[in-house]
Amino acid sequence: MAFEENEISVNSQGGTESVKRGLAERLDPELIKDFQIICSRVRKIEEDKIRVYWLHDLPEDPETNHLKEQASRDRFHKIVYCGNWQYSRYQLVCGIPYDSQGIVIDTPIDPLPTVTKQFDKIRLVYTSTPQRGLNILVPVFEELAKKYPNIHLDVFSSFKIYGWADADKQFEPLYERIRNHPQMTYHGFAPNEEVKAHLLNAHIHAYPSIWLECNSRSVIEAMSAGLMCVHPNFGGLVDTSGGLNFMYQGDQDINKHANIFYQALDHAIQNVSSDGVQDYLKLVKVYADSRYSWSKVASQWEDLLTGLKQQYGDVNNRKVPSAKFVYNT
């Protein structure tokens, strides 16, 4: 199998796994049969294959931190990063040189259709796992709901997306607050197609992220759905959004962050239905659809793999090189 599964990914329906499986469906089986494409977690190396290491995690992750070592990097013919911010961070943390071994290929989506939205009720949505900022969103929304009876928050959030149902237990009190609030609905885990269908009727993607991430497929899909995306300028979100979303300066202090987010979300609720904002969101959608479309990204992968196959057509040229002796004074 060109696209590897491991003990963690096999039960997951997360972004990494969805993209990996989607790419496998779109590429010519004849092209990829000579490849070993590893997503983040290295388990074994196939020396007769052309090896591509596709990174979706941070360089601080123990599963990828081995890239600090030149010998580890030399095992791969190409290292693919899922975003520019992530690539820069690997250079900074792991000392990876800026050279032709690396390449950035964005995380793809299927662009969502353009729809006409109604604004009799302002619908907010959260579509990521709970540890990324749901603990800020819920109390902030509770306060805003006192001010705006016409707002509603839908929460699609659960570790079940990764096959980790037990991890939800610590967030159960938070989920219960959502279930018990008349202006909030907790959906738990839902298939991606169901989430995307809901995005088409929503107006604001409320995402007070406190979790460093390389990029955010949930944000990309919300941009494509024409939502006003409200999130901090944190981690890879600036790169993901192209600086086009309604970003704010967050704070590592949760209480300060919550107060800042309250102001940002309040502003979004007041303005999301205006003609000026709606016209601007059309531009944001064009950007997201152009940059992240599957047709573009799959073509980039096809070009990359075709070039590597030409370069390493001889199986004898694919072996892992012997470790080099480095004299340290």
Give the residues covered by each predicted segment.
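N-terminal pre-catalytic "stem/leader" segment of glycosyltransferase-like enzymes
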Residues: 1-45
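A charged, aromatic-enriched C-terminal amphipathic alpha-helix characteristic of glycosyltransferases
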Residues: 13-18, 252, 256, 273-313
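Active-site proximal beta-strand in glycosyltransferases
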Residues: 35-63, 77-81, 102-106
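A short, active-site helix/loop in glycosyltransferases that binds the activated sugar's phosphate group
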Residues: 76-100, 301
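Conserved donor-binding/catalytic core segment of Leloir-type glycosyltransferases
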Residues: 116-133, 138-141, 145, 154
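Nucleotide-activated donor-binding/catalytic signature segment of Leloir-type glycosyltransferases, i.e.
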Residues: 168-193
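Acidic donor-binding loop of glycosyltransferase active sites
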Residues: 200-214, 227
